Amino acid sequence: EGRVAGAGLDVFAKEPCTASPLFAFDNVVVTPHLGASTHEAQDKAGLAVARSVKLALQGEFVPDAVNVQAGGVVAEEVRPLLPLAEKLGRVFTAVAGGVAPSVTVEVRGEVVAHDVSVLTLAAMKGLFTTVVAEQVTYVNAPLLAADRGVQVGLSTATETLDHPVLVTLRGALLDGRTVTVSGTALTGPRESLRLTGLDDFDLELEAEGVLLFFRYVDRPGVVGTVGTLLGEAGVNIAAMQVAR
């Protein structure tokens, strides 16, 4: 009926398959069923599928998913940056007070020797997570951006000053403001996601839990007042940083 643009098949009801009406279609590719031909291979294939399903249900990136724009193998050096880019997107939207019409994802460091385009998907997922009612995934994030006319670009450079790898989200808002959020991913014993910059302020803050950002007049007593108000409201402060 012409409803399917193309298909690839390697599993058939009866194998080996030597005759099928599907062979007549130019837009259908058929191959012998070579994978998972042993019990051990079938077990590993089942585990791989189960892991992918778990990732999808958790809203995380699924490698090799056919309906993900940046699908495929993600380098081990890039994987830790996926949750970082997503968190930066969430912080960006919170600080901006909404989604910016255009955002650039800047990636710096030797990691750009690998394909880092998947980080734009992670950033979009974070940008829209708190502004739409539906669940935001790596699949629908680009669609949400397109529907709202939001453009998300990618910029890469090998040079970075203070960190081996740095990811920055930069965007201009409709009111003329520019919002910039930067972060890095620490590996090894101190493995964590860190916020390193917000607009013109340098930070060194773990990107976990509930984050509060305040802009106030630089004068004595303000930090104490903020701490007192939060304490009276029953809010426990795990860490605090002041930047100028």
Description of each model-found segment:
Residues N67-R244:
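A conserved regulatory-domain signal marking ACT and ACT-like small-molecule sensing domains
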